Swiss-Prot record:
Xref: PANTHER family: MULTIDRUG RESISTANCE PROTEIN MDTG
Compartmental location: Cell inner membrane
Protein family (similarity comment): Belongs to the major facilitator superfamily. DHA1 family. MdtG (TC 2.A.1.2.20) subfamily.
Membrane topology recorded in Swiss-Prot or TrEMBL: Multi-pass membrane protein
Key words, A-Z: Cell inner membrane, Cell membrane, Membrane, Transmembrane, Transmembrane helix, Transport
Broad class of the protein's primary localization: membrane
Name of the protein in question: Multidrug resistance protein MdtG
Transmembrane spans: 19-39, 56-76, 90-110, 113-133, 144-164, 171-191, 222-242, 254-274, 288-308, 317-337, 376-396
Gene Ontology cellular-component annotations: plasma membrane
One Pfam family matching this protein: Sugar_tr
Stored SUPFAM superfamilies: MFS general substrate transporter (SSF103473)
GO molecular function, one term: transmembrane transporter activity
Amino acid sequence: MSPSDVPINWKRNLTVTWLGCFLTGAAFSLVMPFLPLYVEQLGVTGHSALNMWSGLVFSITFLFSAIASPFWGGLADRKGRKIMLLRSALGMAIVMLLMGMAQNIWQFLILRALLGLLGGFIPNANALIATQAPRHKSGWALGTLSTGGVSGALLGPLAGGLLADHYGLRPVFFITASVLFICFLLTFFFIRENFLPVSKKEMLHVREVVASLKNPRLVLSLFVTTLIIQVATGSIAPILTLYVRELAGNVSNIAFISGMIASVPGVAALLSAPRLGKLGDRIGPEKILIVALIISVLLLIPMSFVQTPWQLALLRFLLGAADGALLPAVQTLLVYNSTNQIAGRIFSYNQSFRDIGNVTGPLMGAAISASYGFRAVFCVTAGVVLFNAIYSWNSLRRRRLAIE
């Protein structure tokens, strides 16, 4: 029996990749609460300079990730997904270690760019599970996997803040590097993949990748949907604390209240993603996607009219429950409309669109709030999501008509 014929326990791989995504999500978000403080510690002074450099070191990671993702996706299709998971976990661990040793802001900026270049654990984990899970269970599998990164991202800021308070800023980077190295070890020892390497000559070029897709227009619309999801999430991030302060008035625990309101969508997504993924396997991810987008619009609009922080928290919890269905539904549809041969590149292209959304969303939110106020951000974001719902529905309708 050849190595490629050995059966794979995809559920065990799902468990290990879930842990890897959890650790990666936690590692990335561990340093987020004090990123501006670390920038200040590296010698940046003045309000405007601090804002500029904090924005740069935050966004440059996503920018370089968007550039590098297609390259790593192509390499994953040639060499296998496990080796890309190992490369990503070890590379990020080394970069995080070096970040804790940075002596000036330029070194830190370069290392943040390197983090984006060497990242990609989560999209490669998605590609691995997408190619191993049975098609009729891919919605549940990808929905479950998505909760790993969400769980880590929820716990990371809390743990990072506590660690920074007790041990200082630099040690948190060393702890984060250790967490990523554990992720590397878990992947090395426990993930199994049957993959026959493909020579560079046998690799499909971009034009051939597009030609091999069952419905290229639909796949493009799914990429755009991923971008819009991140734009919608990111547009609210820069103004959330300030909006909560406006709603709450003069209260002493504004940081706690805004932190709780920031985290409730993640908790809701954690609860809803596997269940809605399983429902998508039964009724079709297309229906889940469109309904979740419409519900998101209906929840975003009243957010601009709330009068108390608790009204906002309730709406954001419901929004998180709907959002928990979106990315897994997109990923399941990508699985349905591509082959295992190109899965790495398709998921990496999707990651690039996600990273672009991560960069543009906060910029859009900040620009709208500066010109028209906080409440306008929710209305404009609702309009963007509504456009995406119509665009996605039209793309899915065209595919259905083409099949008929």
